[in-house]
Amino acid sequence: MNLNATILGQTISFVLFVWFCMKYVWYPFISIIEKRQKEISDNLVSATHAKTESERVNAEALLCLRQARVKAQEIIKQANKCKMQIINEAKHEAEKEQSRILSQAREQIIYERKRVTDELRKQISELVIEGTEKVIEHSINEMIDIDLLNNIINTLSYKD
């Protein structure tokens, strides 16, 4: 009986131990495990959402990058067009300035030519008057007249 009482005591203590574990240890462990499983599943769902959100944001970033490239190309194209327009305007202005300078130079040349021509005419007329005066003064001697005329001709030819 001693053996039966021991087995009975051990059975009772085991049942009490199981009951105690079920009441105070098992359910808190199970609730902690379930809570952690719920957190893990929530974190997995959150990670999945974050991954899809990341893919969406990445796609939006790529789209924005493409749009920025297109816009940059348009800006470059407009800048090149503006550059060409500025170059053409500068070329046109340079041509106008060139023609203005050339016309001023031509006018200056014409003016100088006219001034020099008038001055030469004046000098020639003075020389003719001077020569005529000398011829008249020396008209007595015919030979002197010929020498004077030759001198005048030589003088005129040296001044040209």
Curated annotation (Swiss-Prot):
Residue ranges of the TM segments: 12-32
UniProt-listed InterPro entries: ATP_synth_B-like_membr_sf, ATP_synth_b/b'su_bac/chlpt, ATP_synth_F0_bsu_bac, ATP_synthase_B_chain
UniProt membrane topology term: Single-pass membrane protein
Disulfide bonds, paired cysteine numbers: none
Pfam families xref list: ATP-synt_B (PF00430)
GO cellular component: plasma membrane; proton-transporting ATP synthase complex
Keywords: ATP synthesis, Cell inner membrane, Cell membrane, CF(0), Hydrogen ion transport, Ion transport, Membrane, Transmembrane, Transmembrane helix, Transport
Chief place of localization: membrane
Role noted for this protein: F(1)F(0) ATP synthase produces ATP from ADP in the presence of a proton or sodium gradient. F-type ATPases consist of two structural domains, F(1) containing the extramembraneous catalytic core and F(0) containing the membrane proton channel, linked together by a central stalk and a peripheral stalk. During catalysis, ATP synthesis in the catalytic domain of F(1) is coupled via a rotary mechanism of the central stalk subunits to proton translocation. Component of the F(0) channel, it forms part of the peripheral stalk, linking F(1) to F(0).
Name recorded for this polypeptide: ATP synthase subunit b
Organism (species): Blochmanniella pennsylvanica (strain BPEN)
Lineage, broadest ranks: Bacteria, Pseudomonadati, Pseudomonadota, Gammaproteobacteria, Enterobacterales
Gene: atpF
